[in-house]
Amino acid sequence: MPRLRSLPLVATALVSAGLAVGCGSSSSAGDHSFTGDAYPNVDRASTRQVKSPIYSGNVNQLKKVWSIPIEGKGVYGSYASTPLIVNGVVYSQDLESNVEAIDLESGEVLWEKKYESPSHGPNGLAIAEGRVYGATSAEAFALRQGTGKELWTTPLNGAIDMAPGVNEGRVYVSTVPETPEGGYEAGAIGTLWAMDAKTGKKQWHFDTAPKGLWGHPEINSGGGLWYPPSFDKAGNVYAGTGNPAPLPGTSKYPWGSSRPGPNLYTNSMIKLDPDTGKLIWYYQETPHGIYDWDFQNSPIITKSGGREVAIGSGKGGFAVAVDVKTGEVVWRSHVGIHNGHDKDSLYAMRGEYDRIRTGRVEPGRLGGVIAPMASDEERVYTPIVNRSMTVKSGSAIAEGSADTGEVAALDLETGEILWEASFNSPIYGALLVVNDLVFATSGEGFIHALNVNSGSEVWGAKLPSGSNAGVMISGDMLVTGAGLPAAEGQMPKLVAYKLGG
């Protein structure tokens, strides 16, 4: 997963993609807590902003009302998604790809569908027109919303670690070039697939890296999506993509020299035609990525200074707003820790290896903006992991430790940092905005509710385990997963809170 500072590449281009067929009806799904483009299903713009009576004046009245065990277990804990809440039912997927429907008020499990297919995450679900969409580590699926009955499955050629996107009768799922152990699979390409939402039939695909893999398919791989795409009102598809590999390189091909050039369309934000899958434009944040700095988060589609923009972010520690019509940069802001390595991938692409300093690099390959942002009408909120890594040579990286976390608020029109809230633990989960609060979860197992104007903490709660999952709010209730055990004896659980208990 990559991202870095460089001279970003922005272009308008057309590329070959699979044939598009058919077009379904609108897929917005409603819930009493949602208005307009509200998360998750009708939040096509990925703002992660919801309507609720919860605000700073009553948030301290949230009390835990139920919790249930999370039984599945993946490579990185048990839970890494955001639960969905539709019409009083919570829909949840664990890191073994198992799906449950749970009564929001009581915590009673209404139905479950077992897959027992371990995922690295972040995975999760989407819901539209009476169907629950998800994926195992190898195939996309649809379940009947009321019963959990499987309606269709579609095998995809590659590993899957994401929640689907759904819009206008299509389901979008991407593969990533990953081995079961979590390494990079040589010769694999991350491919975004568009499928008919009713049948699962493939309609088109877009390869986020070329089939020739820059001349060395026996070594290289790259691309793919880790989070769902976003959609504008015309249905256009916006997605953030992952890194190329190997990284930083091999002993024979240090600093990514087995894959010369910028390695399109990795570490990028892409805009695709929804009917054909053809590329409209791309913005590449980190050409020739060598540090696993994905630009992976779902772009936020919103307005900045009177024009529509798409705001992307990733593990290199930058948030970038681009014009949705052209892909041209409107503003670009760094967040979190940086220690002078933002241009190393450019140096590597140019063969200027003497300009790359080995040693401690910030952010690390699991740092930066590792999970989706949220936005309201004035600000963009970024979850930050301040984690370093040690680059030993052009072919070796040692993982660092996750030291601290932050939430930073950026001015929507300028990208200027308005405030930063610091934590003793990484902020691994996606953010959520409701009224004058932004909610975050931490790796050590806390929910934090921050005032959107100042970043001051208004309310907090200890979870039964560490968390790398987002929260969801419906009406006067909040639900989140704690599935990242950080200490012996901690148990993964899905937890619900309610105003007044």
List each model region and its residues.
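Short loop/turn segments that connect beta-strands within beta-propeller blades
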Residues: 103-106, 144-147, 196-199, 274-276, ...
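Repeat-blade elements of multi-bladed beta-propeller folds
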Residues: 31-42, 76-98, 117-140, 160-192, ...
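C-terminal motif of bacterial Sec signal peptides marking the signal peptidase cleavage site
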Residues: 20-22
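Surface-exposed loop and turn segments in beta-propeller and other repeat-based domains
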Residues: 66-74, 115-118, 203-219, 279-292, ...
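Bacterial signal peptide processing site
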Residues: 24-26
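Conserved blade-ending motifs and adjacent loop-strand segments that build the rim/top face
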Residues: 289-290, 339-342, 347-356, 422-429, ...
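A structural motif specific to WD40 beta-propellers
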Residues: 63-65, 108-112, 149-152, 203-205, ...
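Blade/loop signatures of beta-propeller domains
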Residues: 29-65, 396-397
